[in-house]
């Protein structure tokens, strides 16, 4: 299945549609099919790849257009990439043209030591433009951690868009 992002006149992704591979033999064929079936202009259907995230891939292949397009993402025609929604990221965060994602001016989130993993967390401080290490009011117990089906969610590491 080939996937195409429908973009508006401001290059914002409205939705992602699927087209059978035998129809979308290349991007132009998929665009023509979508224009014919939806009435939306072919030039506003942009092929995307669900395996691409932060300019890398989950399956070891080559990244395609920076990120898999999501609703609200921005299509950058000059860079030929999809930018994620800035979402809750603070005003100081900028576009990283290597990862095609938003990044703090202080860089990536520092790692916690193994001893700190269940007792501390990082929070962005927009006033100082730095990561601030804080201690949980109620630390996570090892039993809670071991029982959690999603460790990243438990530790607050899931990115919210």
Please report, for each region that a protein language model flagged, where it lies by residue.
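Viral virion structural and adsorption modules
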Residues: 1-161
């Amino acid at each position: 299945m080939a996937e195409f992002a429908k973009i508006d006149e401001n290059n914002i992704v409205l939705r992602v549609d699927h087209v059978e591979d035998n129809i979308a033999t290349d991007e132009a064929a998929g665009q023509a099919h979508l224009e014919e079936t939806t009435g939306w202009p072919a030039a506003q259907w942009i092929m995307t790849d669900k395996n691409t995230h932060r300019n890398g891939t989950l399956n070891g292949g080559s990244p395609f257009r920076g990120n898999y397009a999501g609703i609200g993402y921005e299509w950058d025609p000059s860079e030929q990439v999809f930018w994620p929604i800035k979402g809750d990221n603070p005003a100081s965060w900028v576009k990283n043209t290597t990862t095609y994602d938003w990044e703090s001016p202080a860089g990536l989130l520092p790692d916690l030591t193994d001893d700190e993993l269940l007792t501390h967390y990082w929070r962005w401080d927009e006033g100082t433009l730095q990561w601030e290490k804080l201690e949980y009011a109620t630390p996570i117990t090892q039993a809670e951690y071991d029982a959690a089906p999603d460790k990243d969610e438990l530790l607050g590491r899931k990115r919210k868009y």
